[in-house]
Amino acid sequence: MVAVLFIVFLVALAIGVPVAFSLGLASVAYMLGAHIQMINFAQYFFKGLDSFTLLCIPGFTFAGNLMNQGGISDKLLDFADALVGHVTGGLAYANVLASMVFAGISGTALSDTVALGGVEIPMMVNQGYDVPFSVAITAASSCLGPIIPPSVPMIMAATMTGLSVSKMFMAGIVPGLLLGFGMCATCYILSVKRHYPKRNTPPKWSHIWHATKEAIWALIMVGIILFGIMGGIVTPTEASIICVVYGLFVSVFIYRKMGPKEMYSCLKDTVSSASAIMALVAFANVFAFILTKEHIPSMIADAMLHLTTNKYLILLLINLFLIFVGMFMETIAAILILFPTLLAVATAVGVDPIHFGIIVVMNLVLGLCTPPVGVCLFAATNIGARYGKCTLSDSVKALVPLLIVNFGVLFLVTYVPFLTVGVANLVMG
């Protein structure tokens, strides 16, 4: 019956059925064939959603939508440009810096690409950067969204396996910063080599002060999330609700751009995004129940450990496997299906679960800007095509140097656990 489970799942995916419903169809087919009472389906479906931690997903999503409704994208980019726009490749740095700050609000990569890309790409093109490079840095920097907390993929990984969401958030900060600095260094080298323009006038303190005042409300929200969780003052779910109240206050009373129409749009986008994730979680929990019942995770773990028990080789094999998976499968779906199984392998060779969670999230998130199914790359390319010639192949070529650096950071994080759990333990104990 295991064969039926995987055949139905793969066939459903092949004909275009969404991943969540493919998991559900495969689970139903297995249960009917194995004569398992369907009450088990309902029980495990509900059990997958019965989590206080999962409440922070609609919370962070709604808070990000509220802030974005107030035009936070423009304000963040102006703030970043005021700080670094006067140096060589300054707008590229500003692109990365804005993504790093926006990551602390949204928690997803695609929202970063769409919200910031519509502002960043035309601004870069107008100042003399070529379109493919503008698209590439926008797509690559958007991957910081799910790595710098709050992070929806990290919430999924922690919830599925009983790990601490707060600790995983803290463990993602340094890898996110390393990715950002690595991309900035790459931008500098490429900007010097290609003679990209820079702003001739140094920044004026009045300009920096004005840009900071405009962006300060977004920066405060990032502080609420990071320091509230890091200090043990609030849980991630409580932080998300505080951010919703804060975002509502800022949008209505500070930015004054929140009317009934805008509120409806924010609620609609939030419900659409959060419900898709919740459905995926529920169906994946039923699928995971079946895999556990058939001892699939332990069989895979035993098979890998028969190949080698060397921790470093195991991590290398898992990295290569996840890089491949990330090129074809949506991040959250891959985490829900694969993470519990691979975690059993990693812990068997002595890898810290939090450290391994960051490795898995980084691998799969980087797949968001790699073909053939890189949704962030496609979204950024579509935006760039409005402002000049830019095909998908042009974007991929421009993306290669950034991907090399990003994967280099991935392997550094993989083999230096202090960058993740070491920092998290120092901060949270």
Short names for language-model regions:
Residues 1-429:
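Alpha-helical transmembrane segments of multi-pass membrane transport proteins
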